[in-house]
From Swiss-Prot:
Annotated stretches, region: NMP: 34-63
UniProt enzyme class: transferase
Pathway noted in the entry: Purine metabolism; AMP biosynthesis via salvage pathway; AMP from ADP: step 1/1
Lineage: Bacteria, Pseudomonadati, Campylobacterota, Epsilonproteobacteria, Campylobacterales
Protein name in the entry: Adenylate kinase
Classification via PROSITE patterns: ADENYLATE_KINASE
This protein's record includes keyword Membrane: no
Domains (record comment): Consists of three domains, a large central CORE domain and two small peripheral domains, NMPbind and LID, which undergo movements during catalysis. The LID domain closes over the site of phosphoryl transfer upon ATP binding. Assembling and dissambling the active center during each catalytic cycle provides an effective means to prevent ATP hydrolysis.
Assembly with partners or alone: Monomer.
Top-rank taxon: Bacteria
Compartment(s) where it occurs, according to its Swiss-Prot or TrEMBL record: Cytoplasm
GO molecular function: adenylate kinase activity; ATP binding
């Protein structure tokens, strides 16, 4: 059975970097995906699912929830490792509920933990505005992204806390101790 870990956190929390470093350090045992990468890879594959995804993306439309979840589940089942990390998902209560429903209807993938990389809004803002990645990293866009992240957050955290799947990592430190703590946490959860 595949063991899935979801890594969530504010923009600038370091969740993508953390997940990426963990998977790189143990590539024979851990695979890291981001939802955007999975959708782009499916389009590039030329599959029927990829053509469906492309028909939305090419028009600038959001890919429907069922298509996104189908893409994620197919990738998880086909992953080359037993342990899989996805960062930045779920982003909404609707995504969370639908994903939970789909996972409960199959027996190949087990959600083991939802790890929140917790940072203050000040730290997140400092990191995002300091990284100069492009036009999307301005203050107005940052606050909009924070709003999108924080609006459903309490409901998402409550849901996973009730299932005893929510774990917190302090993201306001240097990357090395964060990654070390996250690796340790994943090992600990897997041994339960």
């Amino acid at each position: 059975m595949k063991e899935l870990f979801l890594i969530i956190g504010a923009p600038g929390s370091g969740k993508t970097t953390d997940a990426s470093l963990i998977a790189q350090a143990d590539a024979t045992n851990i695979t890291h995906y981001s939802t955007g990468d999975l959708l782009r890879a499916e389009v590039a594959s030329g599959s029927e699912l990829g053509k469906t995804i492309d028909s939305f993306i090419s028009k600038g439309n959001l890919v429907p929830l069922d298509v996104v979840i189908n893409t994620i589940v197919c990738a998880l089942k086909a992953a080359p490792t037993k342990t899989i990390i996805i960062d930045g998902y779920p982003r909404s209560v609707e995504q969370m509920m639908e994903f939970d429903k789909v996972l409960s209807e199959q027996n190949e993938i087990c959600l083991k933990g939802v790890i929140e990389v917790r940072v203050s809004e000040e730290v997140a803002k400092e990191r995002v505005l300091g990284r100069n990645r492009g036009t999307d990293d301005n203050e107005e866009v940052f606050y909009n992204r924070m709003k999108v992240y924080t609006e459903p957050l309490n409901e998402i955290l409550d849901f996973y806390q009730k299932k005893k799947l929510h774990f917190i990592i302090d993201g306001e430190r240097a990357i090395e101790p964060i990654v070390a703590d996250m690796k340790e946490l994943i090992k600990k959860i897997q041994s339960i």
